[in-house]
Curated annotation (Swiss-Prot):
Residue pairs linked by disulfide bridges in the UniProt entry: C61-C77, C70-C83, C76-C90, C95-C99, C108-C125, C117-C131, C124-C138, C143-C147, C213-C229, C222-C235, C228-C242, C247-C251, C260-C277, C269-C283, C276-C290, C295-C299
Family: In the central section; belongs to the extensin family.
Pfam families documented for this protein: Chitin_bind_1
InterPro entries: Chitin-bd_1 (IPR001002), Endochitinase-like_sf (IPR036861)
Residues carrying sugar: 50-51, 53, 55, 151-198, 200-206, 209
GO biological process: defense response
Lineage: Eukaryota, Viridiplantae, Streptophyta, Embryophyta, Tracheophyta
Modification after translation: Heavily glycosylated with beta-arabinose on hydroxyprolines and with alpha-galactose on serines of the extensin-like domain. As no other sugars could be detected in the native lectin, it is unlikely that the three putative N-glycosylation sites are actually glycosylated. The N-terminus is blocked. The N-terminal sequences proposed in PubMed:9022287 and PubMed:11056399 originate probably from truncated proteins.
Region (Disordered): 154-203
Stretches the record annotates as 10 X approximate repeats of S-P-P-P-P: 151-206
Subunit: Homodimer.
Signal peptide, first to last residue: 1-22
Name of the molecule in the record: Chitin-binding lectin 1
């Protein structure tokens, strides 16, 4: 009877081995590798470790999603690329697209939820999100929408050549002496001087500086010590650059446990743990963190299969001893 029970147990274990090998799935319990102890293989059922936390959702909108928009009415696109309706998505400093407004006069483009410059004024919307008419706003490298440089005036026509002078006539015969002329009339009073021309209009205000760092500048960093890169891509040291919600890179920290990548100023996952840094900026060991399509740094796909292979070798050795 005892030998029959062991045979049934061996067949059940072989069946589990085939299922796990075919699907490359991790078991819901820990099987110890021990070739001398029989039924202790299944003691790991009571010591099952909890699953690792799911990574945060990947970006859904804005600069992190190719300029995509939120679908539901009333949702705002946050600076991290996620959609929602609370202050963490819609309030100033946290919203990058589909924000509730209002916006300052002269604002335009994605920085003002797609607002356009006034029509008929010849204004262009610059990369910085401001309206203007100079090349700082309208040149192709500086413009994000309504890009149209005014055409230069046509050149003046070349001067026409002077007409040919006619041949000089023969000298006339001397005229008879003129009669005595009356005294000349007195000259008219001088006309009043014309009014001065109107003053020229003031020059237009200069354009804001172009982005210097972060995702608006190809991942560039601020140069000066202590400067933070704001969500708009400019460098500075005040709260408008360094405080949470306004800082995207070179922020003073601290960062939550498990954060990594550009979302945590280039912070790495702990070494020697097999953790990968996901596109969302969190550390983990599953394919949600380590697969090439999901990983931004410390991408190590070997950690996905090696624990399963070690468990399979232990089960195989145990089955050979039992049978």
């Amino acid at each position: 009877m005892k030998e029959t029970a062991i045979s049934v147990l061996a067949l059940l274990t072989l069946f589990l081995l085939e299922v796990v090998s075919a699907n490359e799935l991790s078991l819901p319990f820990h099987l110890p590798i021990n070739e001398t102890i029989g039924l202790e293989v299944f003691q790991g059922i009571n010591n099952a470790s909890p699953p690792s936390p799911s990574p945060l959702p990947y970006p859904q909108c804005g600069m992190k999603k190719g300029g995509g928009k939120c679908i539901k009415t009333g949702e705002c696109c946050s600076i991290w690329g996620w959609c929602g309706t609370t202050n963490a998505y819609c309030s100033p400093g946290y919203c990058q697209k589909q924000c509730p407004g209002p916006y300052p006069e002269g604002r335009c483009g994605w920085q003002a939820n797609g607002k356009s410059c006034p029509t008929g004024t010849g204004q262009c919307c610059s990369n910085g999100g401001w309206c203007g008419t100079t090349s700082d706003y309208c040149a192709s490298k500086n413009c994000q929408s309504q890009c149209k440089l005014p055409s230069p005036p046509p050149p003046p026509p070349p001067p026409s050549p002077p007409p040919p002078s006619p041949p000089s006539p023969p000298p006339p015969s001397p005229p008879p002496p003129p009669p005595p002329s009356p005294p000349p009339p007195s000259p008219p009073p001088p006309s009043p001087s014309p009014p001065p021309p109107p003053a020229s209009p003031p020059p237009p205000p200069p354009a804001l500086p172009y982005p210097q760092c972060g995702i608006k500048k190809g991942g560039g960093k601020c140069i000066k010590t202590g400067e933070c890169c704001s969500i708009w891509g400019w460098c500075g040291t005040t709260n408008a650059y360094c405080s949470p919600g306004y800082c995207q890179k070179q922020c003073p920290g601290p960062y939550p446990e498990g954060r990594c990548g550009w979302q945590a100023n280039g912070k790495s996952c702990p070494t020697g743990t097999g953790h990968c840094c996901s596109n969302a900026g969190w550390c983990g060991t599953t394919s949600d963190y380590c697969a090439p399509v999901n990983c931004q740094a410390q991408c190590n796909t070997t950690t996905l299969t090696s624990p399963i292979k070690n468990r399979m070798r232990g089960i195989e050795s145990f089955m050979l001893n039992v049978v």
